[in-house]
A protein has these predicted regions:
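GST-like domain detector, emphasizing the conserved glutathione-binding G-site
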Residues: 1-130, 137
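A structural signal for the main folded, soluble domain(s) of proteins
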Residues: 20, 192-195, 202
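Glycine-rich, flexible loop/turn motifs
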Residues: 40-43, 81, 141-142, 147, ...
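Residues that scaffold the ATP/ADP-binding catalytic core of kinase and kinase-like folds
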Residues: 73, 168, 198
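Phosphate/oxyanion-binding loops and surfaces in catalytic or ligand/nucleic-acid-binding neighborhoods
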Residues: 77-81, 168, 192
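Acidic/polar loop patches that form or flank catalytic/metal-binding clefts of enzymes
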Residues: 83, 196-199
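GST-like fold's C-terminal all-alpha helical module
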Residues: 93-191
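Acidic/histidine-enriched, glycine/proline-rich intrinsically disordered or flexible terminal extensions
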Residues: 202-216
């Protein structure tokens, strides 16, 4: 095996890491360790003190504990797919869009999802998030995916966060005419085999457990 992946099924950061790993790696390349966030395993804390998933511990001893870096590592293992998912002429623009997702949009998303913990109400944070969502909607108006008619790294990196936003109030999101293309884009990922392959449920990892191979 190439290493160990500490993951949490519903975390959008972990989701996007798993998406890239499933696409790029041969089956059974990694050991998957499902983490319970309220009881994180000491083995993970020892290698990544920031204590967030995902964490990839490579056989060489290298630790990669940022999801986007895990995605890029996965792509480096499959250079042919990397050329398809990260077209050179879109590389900088894709990086900027992913950074906006991980920055301002994620800030608003967290507060929208847990508005009772913050200063303003749900609608306030939903409105804050809408600028980014409308930017995605515009991109999808004349093409199937965010940068062209084929999936790129940006789609894989951003989709789990749009999914999380939509699920805060699914009925409201699906009724919004302003997000028609975004709804279709999201539905395609949610209904696809790739997403199903990364969302299998696993028991929380314990040291005495038999290793779970990933991708399956």
């Amino acid at each position: 095996m190439l290493g160990i992946l500490y993951s949490f099924r519903r975390c959008p950061y972990a989701m996007r890491a798993r998406l890239a790993l499933v696409l790029c790696l041969p089956k059974a390349s990694l050991e998957l360790r499902e983490v319970v966030l309220k009881n994180k395993p000491q083995a993970m804390l020892d290698i990544s003190p920031k204590a967030t998933v995902p964490v990839l511990q490579l056989e060489s001893g290298e630790i990669i504990d940022e999801s986007i870096d895990i995605m890029h590592w996965a792509l480096d293992q499959n250079l042919q797919l990397k050329e398809e998912l990260v077209p050179l002429h879109f590389k900088d623009e894709m990086k900027d869009l992913i950074s906006e997702n991980d920055g301002d949009f994620k800030w608003a998303l967290d507060r929208y999802k847990y508005s009772d913990r913050f200063e303003h109400n749900e609608e306030y944070y939903r409105e804050k998030a809408s600028a980014f969502l409308l930017k995605l909607e515009i991109r999808l108006t004349n093409q199937k995916y965010l940068f062209s008619d084929v999936v790129t790294l940006a789609d894989l990196a951003i989709f789990p966060f749009v999914r999380q936003f939509a699920h805060v109030n699914k009925a409201w999101f699906e009724q919004q005419g302003q997000y028609k293309q975004l709804n279709d884009w999201l539905a395609e990922f949610l209904e696809g085999d790739l997403f199903a392959s990364i969302m299998k449920k696993y028991s929380a990892w314990l040291p005495e457990h038999t290793a779970t191979q990933f991708p399956e």
